[in-house]
């Protein structure tokens, strides 16, 4: 009798554990870059912060797509060192035209990876919107901690340009941001007449 009860209990535990293991594997497989916590008050999450103290304007720059990704990996892992190196390299290439006149602020963000652009527009939007949430969070941190009287330039290339356009649509109806803005350069992305 005890053996039967023990065997029944053992089988029940094994079944529960195997179900939990299958569930846990599903969770692990669905781990995403968005399981990582991003805190823009930590300078680790900025590629550039206030580089150029004596410059007359502030530049909020959003890097282009640099993560080649893999099938099923549609947003970059912000803590991945290879991603950060590629991100810094691309950012440095783009900033040459701004360096003489601006303090540079460039956040790392969990950008959409190249495979995203092979998805349907609806699917793309999930990953691009997720990337935008990082950019918005970084911009709000930047705006709260920089001099509101300094001229502001927004710039981005490719996906970075898309993020700049989204930022302007989302936040730049507000006077505190409008007053600062002197130029926006969303280069390498479609800008409609309505968006101008």
Regions found by a protein language model. Give the residues of each.
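Bacterial N-terminal signal peptides that target proteins for export
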Residues: 1-10
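Flexible, membrane-associating and regulatory peripheral segments of lipid-active enzymes
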Residues: 5, 25-96
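Sec-dependent signal peptide cleavage junction
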Residues: 19-25
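Extracellular/periplasmic catalytic domains that process cell-envelope and extracellular macromolecules
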Residues: 52-55, 98-100, 146-147, 175-178
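Active-site catalytic motif of lipid deacylating hydrolases and related acyltransferases
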Residues: 62-151
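Surface cap/lid and interfacial helix-loop subdomains adjacent to catalytic sites
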Residues: 134-148, 169-196
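Gly/Ala-rich beta-loop-alpha elbow adjacent to hydrolase catalytic centers
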Residues: 156-160, 164
């Amino acid at each position: 009798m005890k053996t039967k009860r023990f065997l029944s209990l053992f089988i029940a535990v094994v079944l529960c554990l195997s179900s939990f293991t299958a569930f846990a594997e599903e969770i692990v497989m669905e781990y995403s870059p968005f399981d990582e916590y991003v805190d823009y008050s930590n300078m680790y999450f900025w590629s550039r912060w206030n580089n150029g103290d004596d410059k007359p304007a502030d530049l909020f720059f959003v890097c282009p797509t640099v993560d080649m990704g893999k099938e099923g990996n549609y947003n970059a892992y912000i803590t991945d060192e290879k991603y950060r190196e590629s991100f810094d390299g691309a950012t440095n290439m783009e900033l040459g035209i701004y360096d003489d006149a601006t303090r540079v602020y460039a956040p790392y963000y969990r950008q959409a990876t190249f495979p995203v652009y092979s998805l349907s527009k609806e699917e793309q939007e999930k990953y691009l919107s997720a990337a935008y949430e990082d950019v918005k969070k970084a911009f709000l941190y930047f705006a709260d901690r920089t001099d509101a009287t300094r001229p502001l330039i927004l710039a981005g290339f490719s996906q970075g340009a898309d993020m700049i356009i989204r930022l302007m649509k989302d936040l730049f109806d507000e006077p505190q941001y409008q007053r600062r803005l002197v130029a926006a350069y969303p280069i390498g992305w479609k800008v409609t007449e309505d968006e101008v």
